[in-house]
Curated annotation (Swiss-Prot):
Glycans are attached at N258. SMART domains: CLECT. Residues 49-64 have a biased composition (Basic and acidic residues). It comes from the Eukaryota. Its main location: secreted. Residues 155-271 form the C-type lectin domain. This is Collectin-10. The gene is COLEC10. It is linked to 3MC syndrome 3: A form of 3MC syndrome, an autosomal recessive disorder characterized by facial dysmorphism, craniosynostosis, learning disability, and genital, limb and vesicorenal anomalies. Facial features include hypertelorism, blepharophimosis, blepharoptosis and highly arched eyebrows, cleft lip and/or palate. The term 3MC syndrome includes Carnevale, Mingarelli, Malpuech, and Michels syndromes. The lineage of its organism: Eukaryota, Metazoa, Chordata, Craniata, Vertebrata. GO terms for molecular function: chemoattractant activity; D-mannose binding. Pfam families: Collagen, Lectin_C. Keywords: Calcium, Collagen, Cytoplasm, Disease variant, Disulfide bond, Glycoprotein, Golgi apparatus, Lectin, Mannose-binding, Secreted, Signal. The keyword RNA-binding does not apply. It is found in: Secreted; Golgi apparatus; Cytoplasm.
Length: 277
């Protein structure tokens, strides 16, 4: 009987516990009031700010932004290497007919001809040969006179004239010397201005003048071996000679000087000293 009563009380306790758990799960307290009503009278405030978290991993690369404004012009770079030779340009217009050239060299002897009639021509052959030489010299002199008549410039001490035959620098030197002059040497501003005006009014762009550094690289001299001590009129940035081949000098129609390659051909100016009376 006692054992049955003990079992009954235990079962009642278990049922009471289950009942209380059921009430709690339904949101009711012991007084059968909804839990929500109890919580509604209390204000839930946020807690204090937590510590900074660890730095996260880098995000993905963003999209490209808009192109910015163009920056200022940079400093001029160093001179680059010489490029490959360009393509051959279009053929230029046909120039005006030039003067008749000088007599060329003798050709290869031809085949022996047939025997001719007997003639006592020995005394004439020497005369004919000398006549041919005289005619060749006369043609050369006439060409020189023609150039001089076309226009000269002069100062109190010198004559200047433009030779309108394209020659390289050494040929120009020889041409002037054979005729008793030299390539023009503008040793002061007055002479330089006179020659430049002469070139410009003749309709030319550039001519050889008597200045070079053929004897010693970088040390420019007049053709009479005097240095450029008192006067020179180099163009801006000249003499440049980036590859070591520009040893001769040209004058532009502006009067400025440029160093240039000696093998180029162009017109040139000779100067002659006036004979004292």
């Amino acid at each position: 009987m006692n054992g049955f009563a003990s079992l009954l009380r235990r079962n009642q306790f278990i049922l009471l516990v289950l009942f209380l758990l059921q009430i709690q799960s339904l949101g009711l307290d012991i007084d059968s009031r909804p839990t929500a009503e109890v919580c509604a009278t209390h204000t839930i405030s946020p807690g204090p700010k937590g510590d900074d978290g660890e730095k996260g991993d880098p995000g993905e690369e963003g999209k490209h932004g808009k192109v910015g404004r163009m920056g200022p012009k940079g400093i001029k770079g160093e001179l680059g290497d010489m490029g490959d030779q360009g393509n051959i340009g279009k053929t230029g217009p046909i120039g005006k007919k030039g003067d008749k050239g000088e007599k060329g060299l003798l050709g290869i002897p031809g085949e022996k001809g047939k025997a001719g009639t007997v003639c006592d021509c020995g005394r004439y052959r020497k005369f004919v040969g000398q006549l041919d030489i005289s005619i060749a010299r006369l043609k050369t002199s006439m060409k020189f006179v023609k150039n001089v008549i076309a226009g000269i410039r002069e100062t109190e001490e010198k004559f200047y004239y433009i030779v309108q035959e394209e020659k390289n620098y050494r040929e120009s030197l020889t041409h002037c010397r054979i005729r008793g002059g030299m390539l023009a040497m503008p040793k002061d501003e007055a002479a330089n201005t006179l020659i430049a005006d002469y070139v410009a009014k003749s309709g030319f762009f550039r001519v050889f003048i008597g200045v070079n550094d053929l004897e010693r690289e970088g040390q420019y001299m007049f053709t009479d071996n005097t240095p450029l001590q008192n006067y020179s009129n180099w163009n801006e940035g000249e003499p440049s000679d980036p590859y070591g081949h520009e040893d001769c000098v040209e004058m532009l129609s502006s009067g400025r000087w440029n160093d240039t390659e000696c093998h180029l051909t162009m017109y040139f100016v000779c100067e002659f000293i006036k004979k004292k009376k």
